[in-house]
């Protein structure tokens, strides 16, 4: 069963695009090095400063291991001064997926 990592950030005013750019680069780079990462979506709402990454992994173990990767720690260090609250990370079962 695939698993989804949802990683949500509350961005400080004036830093929305900075966080979007950092998140997009991290997702691109991580997708290139992790064969277990199936897809990534970065979504956001500029008005509220919410930025959320949704990554689909081929196993729960792969989804959990992201926290141990140096590239993830580097990303967290880069966004830390730009966010107003600690990131919220959850791992969910992927129940159904449709795409065209």
Question: Each PLM stretch: what is its role?
Answer:
Residues 25-38, 56-90:
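An amphipathic, aromatic/His-enriched active-site/gating alpha helix that lines ligand/cofactor pockets
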Residues 17-19, 52, 63-65, 99:
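Short acidic, gly/pro-rich beta-turn/loop elements at beta-sheet edges
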Residues 1-4, 8-10, 38-49, 75-100:
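Glycine-rich beta-strand-turn "strand-cap" elements at beta-sheet edges
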Residues 16-17, 27-30, 42-43:
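Intrinsically disordered, low-complexity segments enriched in polar/charged residues with Gly/Pro
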Residues 13-15, 61, 95:
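Residues that cap or initiate secondary-structure elements
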């Amino acid at each position: 069963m695939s698993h989804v990592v949802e990683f949500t950030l509350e961005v400080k005013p004036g830093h929305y695009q900075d966080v979007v750019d950092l998140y997009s680069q991290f997702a691109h780079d991580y997708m290139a090095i992790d064969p277990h990462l199936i897809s990534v979506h970065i979504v956001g709402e500029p008005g509220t400063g919410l930025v959320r990454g949704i990554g689909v992994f081929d196993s729960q173990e792969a989804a959990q291991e992201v926290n141990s990767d140096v590239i993830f720690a580097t990303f967290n260090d880069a966004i830390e001064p730009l966010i107003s609250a600690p990131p919220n990370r959850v791992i969910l079962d992927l129940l159904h997926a449709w795409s065209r």
